[in-house]
Amino acid sequence: MRHQLRVPQLGRPADQRKALLRGLTTQLIREGRVTTTKTRAKALRDEVERMIGLAKDGSLAARRRAIGYIYDKKLVHSLFEKAQERYGDRQGGYTRIVRTVPRRGDNAEMAIIELV
């Protein structure tokens, strides 16, 4: 039974879903903005909030956990350098999701997720 699932299934097995979210997280932190479906954006929001929370913590253990999740090691180091000054006064809400026009091919609800 699927009671109280925290992450949407996204129509994929668990390993593919994790790889998708890792890739989107890496891209969002690198670019600052990603266009994807609304459901993926909502799932991505939790992962990005977790990574920025680790970066604000700044400990060695948090850095190692982030390196294990984000694909680019240099990106992790730059995130840890900038996160405290950029998000130091925030307790959460590091991302913004803006709905856009539906995708042309299959009419899927699209959204832009960006770092605040």
From Swiss-Prot:
Q: Which organism is this entry from?
A: Prochlorococcus marinus (strain SARG / CCMP1375 / SS120)
Listed PANTHER family: LARGE RIBOSOMAL SUBUNIT PROTEIN BL17M, RIBOSOMAL PROTEIN L17
Q: Which InterPro entries match?
A: Ribosomal_bL17, Ribosomal_bL17_sf
Task: Show the disulfide pairing.
Answer: none
* Protein name as it appears in the record: Large ribosomal subunit protein bL17
Q: Where would one find coiled-coil regions in this protein?
A: none
Q: Does the keyword Ribosomal protein apply?
A: yes
Q: Which GO terms describe its cellular component?
A: cytosolic large ribosomal subunit
Q: Which residues cross the membrane?
A: none
Q: Which GO terms describe its biological process?
A: translation
Family, per entry = Belongs to the bacterial ribosomal protein bL17 family.
Q: Which UniProt keywords apply?
A: Ribonucleoprotein, Ribosomal protein
Query: Residue span of the signal peptide, if any?
Result: none
Instruction: State one Pfam family annotation.
Output: Ribosomal_L17
| SUPFAM superfamilies per the UniProt record, alphabetical | Prokaryotic ribosomal protein L17 (SSF64263)
How does this protein assemble? Answer: Part of the 50S ribosomal subunit. Contacts protein L32.
Single GO MF annotation:
structural constituent of ribosome
